[in-house]
């Protein structure tokens, strides 16, 4: 079977390629060029060292449109975007997956820490958490559709990160000791400096909950719900961003406790397996990647408006971010907080 491994030049995709080759797959490395400043040279060099074929797909224009422009637009609207979710759905496992299949691959693999299985009863592919809770990336994959999951392999889903590093050492790979980047791939530093040339903004007012003006903000795109640092407001007590109103160009500030709520509404709901709907009564959900899962009741309000009622109040549910819900190790679905 021919498998195209999405190679970034990092440890995870490299070990994925080696594992699949050991398992007898015919492996080709596939790298997407999505930034002007890089062209996949590192991935090509590693593929050469592994003695596997390597191909490059230029996706700079669609990446700019689907991910970078979306990223800037969301901040302009007072939202906090989730570019990795967008990229996985539309670019990596959308256009790049299609390119791999067009090039003759039967399956596509990546170094994501997640798992996929097939349920005979429901005849559905199901997305599962990776076994390493610190590295699990299923949150970022919740929008994948059945036709995408049917073509994917995640070789690292059953391993912990340290096991992957140990395998890299065993393969004598120099990148075994490389530090992982925690940044968004197309933003080398502060996101505010990145978006500044690409968004419209003007100064406006910080208000408290009584409507009193507390100070001036630098522009809607530069703030997010729950933010405390960088407000430059003297109020004699800690204040946090409670609400962002781009239409009025105002930002509401208040105390930390006001950020907590048991009720969350979201839209653009996506089920991994449509048969799961009847099961969706009690779930565990997380409102951002780094959040702890919390028990909740899920139900539909109207059309594409969904509601989660949590047992424990959640802090700073942020419009634009993804809420993802689980049962056990299985990702049932998720949507966009509004």
Curated annotation (Swiss-Prot):
InterPro entries: MnmA-like, MnmA-like_C, MnmA-like_central, MnmA-like_central_sf, Rossmann-like_a/b/a_fold. One of its GO terms (biological process) is tRNA wobble position uridine thiolation. SUPFAM superfamilies: Adenine nucleotide alpha hydrolases-like (SSF52402). The record marks 112, 321 as: Interaction with tRNA. GO terms for cellular component: cytoplasm. It comes from the Bacteria. Disulfide bonds join 87-185. GO terms for molecular function: ATP binding; tRNA binding; tRNA-uridine 2-sulfurtransferase activity. Signal peptide: none annotated. ATP binds at residues 6-13, 32, 111. It is found in: Cytoplasm. Its EC number is 2.8.1.13. The keyword tRNA-binding applies. It is an enzyme of class 2 (transferase). The keyword Transferase applies. HAMAP family: tRNA_thiouridyl_MnmA. Belongs to the MnmA/TRMU family. This is tRNA-specific 2-thiouridylase MnmA. It comes from Syntrophomonas wolfei subsp. wolfei (strain DSM 2245B / Goettingen). The gene is mnmA.
């Amino acid at each position: 079977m021919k498998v195209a491994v999405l190679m970034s030049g990092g440890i995870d995709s490299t070990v994925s390629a080696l594992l699949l080759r050991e398992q007898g797959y015919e492996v080709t490395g596939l790298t997407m060029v999505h930034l002007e400043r890089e062209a996949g040279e590192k991935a090509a060099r590693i593929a050469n060292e592994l003695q596997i074929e390597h191909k490059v797909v230029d996706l700079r224009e669609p990446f700019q449109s689907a991910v970078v422009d979306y990223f800037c637009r969301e901040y302009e609207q007072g939202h906090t975007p989730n570019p990795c979710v967008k990229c996985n759905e539309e670019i990596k496992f959308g256009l790049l997956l299609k390119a791999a299949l067009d090039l003759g691959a039967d399956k596509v693999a990546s170094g994501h820490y997640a798992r996929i299985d097939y349920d005979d009863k429901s005849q559905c592919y199901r997305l599962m958490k990776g076994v390493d809770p610190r590295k699990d990336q299923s949150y970022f994959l919740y929008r994948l559709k059945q036709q995408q999951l049917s073509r994917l392999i995640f070789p690292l889903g059953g391993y912990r990160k340290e096991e992957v590093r140990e395998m890299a050492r065993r393969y004598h790979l120099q990148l075994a000791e490389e530090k992982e980047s925690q940044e968004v791939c197309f933003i080398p530093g502060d996101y505010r400096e990145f978006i500044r040339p690409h968004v419209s903004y003007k100064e406006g007012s910080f208000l408290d909950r009584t409507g009193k003006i507390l100070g001036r903000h630098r522009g809607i795109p530069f703030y997010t719900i729950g933010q405390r640092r960088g407000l430059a407001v003297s109020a004699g007590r800690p204040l946090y961003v409670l609400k962002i109103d781009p239409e009025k160009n105002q930002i509401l500030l208040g105390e930390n406790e006001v950020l907590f709520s048991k009720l969350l509404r979201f839209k653009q709901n996506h089920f991994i397996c449509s048969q799961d709907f009847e099961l969706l009564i009690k779930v565990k959900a997380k409102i951002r990647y780094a959040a702890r899962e919390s028990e909740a009741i899920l139900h539909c309000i109207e059309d594409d408006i969904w509601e989660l009622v949590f047992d424990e109040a959640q802090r700073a549910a942020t419009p634009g971010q993804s809420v993802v819900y689980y049962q056990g190790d299985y990702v049932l679905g998720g949507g966009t907080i509004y």
